[in-house]
């Protein structure tokens, strides 16, 4: 029989701290906390963020930036897309409260605090926090900086195509289309005819003509599934030897991939030098690997002049080399040789493995494929943090064999299956050996009229018979 739980007539006025409920210790977040403590994350972050806070000693103290970063970590590892969801999850979970060092009687930060802290901390502070994780990776041999891969993906902006306005006339999109239809002799009230007219109208999605007033930085472009939407373009530079992200930034959705590629690669080299404690002009990068979207002859020249090998396929198969300058011909030929070589093909395979994996973890499993933030700066800050947390997961995988909560759960299931298989193998071996012993024993005792001994558990020496 069970006891029916009744609603309390009057809540308790005083509750002893010893009577408060406690949660079982979260294995993942305890390991994450150990990882952060291993390279002094909290003290270094506070030292980085000190210039952003006033030191007058008056007024209400601000929220610890370490708490803010840990809450964003929770959103990354648990695929929470919005800051409201992150704040609700942190307030609801006792294990996450322990990770944040918050007691049950303390109120966790509200989602509105995220906006204030994000605006308070400049982009340079986020860059230094990202470099802090590179220091930790370097200390554990997870950052080499010789072979780099670069690629971009798509983030769907928190903006709608319906809200587009014309840059010159400030007309809404459909009002503008109806006016053009009327000028071409089409009834503007006929929705089918107007849509057909708009469908066949050239240059209708030009970013030079249209802007979203709620997020002017978002651009019209194609999403991953081919649909037209307002987008941003995140880009990651990855160490192809270890999978660590050495640079992460967000570009406008209409920017070409190859634009200033050489400059961005050299900026990634600066991050590697800072993590390794080397001089700024030290060059460790040997190769740069990417897809056809990053192919530009001038960019190839710039990288090859720095003695960096370019493994980037030419999108034009029958490129007319006789129209190029001698130096350009040399750069194109060198890139072709690199792509066709055995080492180049290996680098292209590693580029697909490491870069696509990083985008899957950050965008699809990290909650920012469809962003809830607006503005290039806000999104760039969030993407840098997500890349830093991805590097933390790489470090956790090195130290503890797990990098995400889902991987920890999968390891438990895998361990159970392995133990089950091991027990099955042991049982089969025991069964074979015991069957042979039983047959010998049965033949020896048959004259004493002892029969029916068919299992090993019934033999002398087994007290439980199990």
What are these regions (language model features)?
Residues 37, 59-67, 82, 106-109, ...:
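Secondary-structure capping and boundary motifs in well-ordered enzyme cores
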Residues 297-377, 381:
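Helix-centered, glycine/charged polyanion-binding patches within enzymatic domains
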Residues 1-33:
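Hydrophobic alpha-helical membrane-insertion signals
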Residues 40-44, 51, 79, 237-242, ...:
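Function-dense linear segments that define catalytic or interfacial modules
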Residues 26-73, 78:
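Basic, short loop/linker segments at the boundary and entry of helix-turn-helix/winged-helix-like folds
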Residues 85-99:
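DNA-recognition alpha helix
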Residues 255-258, 345-433, 438-442, 446-451, ...:
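Basic, amphipathic alpha-helical segments enriched in Lys/Arg and hydrophobic/aromatic residues
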Residues 64, 91, 100-105, 109-308, ...:
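Polybasic low-complexity intrinsically disordered regions
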